[in-house]
Amino acid sequence: MIYVYGDDGADANKERVIAVSVIAGREEWWQSVEDQWVVRCGEIPFHATDCESNHGDYEHIPNEENKAMYRDLTGILAASMVGGIGIAIDLTAQKKIIPGAMPLAYYRAFLECVEKAANVAENLGEVAELTFDISTENEYNADLLYSWARNGDARFRQWLAPKISFVPWRESVRVQAADLLAFEAWKALDHTVGPVKRTRRSWELLRATQRFETYSYSEDWFRDLKAHLDSGELENIVGFNESDYKAWLKTTGCQHSISNLFHFLGWISKKIDNPVTAP
């Protein structure tokens, strides 16, 4: 079994960048990380944003100690055998190029992380079991999206466990590690499109291992997406359009919501019997 742990990160107001990350490894790889992580963190469960900004549990700890904590935990990941990916999406670009678009950035990144987990599982020849941080905003919808993706793709069914799990980040060192990678992913993009442009040393250390990477989606990607939407090409690829969704809402008596959109995707996938395509 390959164990995959995930979390998300964003700027304080979730206005510029959002990212989702996963880190994967065999149990013995994870156990090595966990043993070192617990010793280094002591009684404070790690939270990347708070540690970096001296907030939350780190508010009354000297800045240099917090920076040393972050640096040491990054070093533990870099020296380990686990590997991961962070998917970051430029929310400012989305609002600029496709104003009024549904708030699907988190789920777009989440679904790509699921796909990457399946790739790792296939490469290692073992099924992947995914566990994410509990989020009152996204947990239910992420569960729906995972089920839709897995049920609609034979390769996903082969290499991904039937169910995704959710745990509180404070109770899982492994989710805390994914939180660090998610923080690095959104910072990497934010330092490209935001007011401060620089490369973080912590990210350079992780990237140098060639086991950690980030993908970013910004203006060029959203321009391509808008072109597909305007041309009708995307409709031909996915096999449905907005009118189909509205008709489904009317037939089922449902109101529009992200959850109902994912229920619709599950229904339409079964109807057209096509491979899954990311929303």
Model-derived regions, located:
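Phosphate-ester processing/binding pockets and catalytic centers
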Residues: 1-279
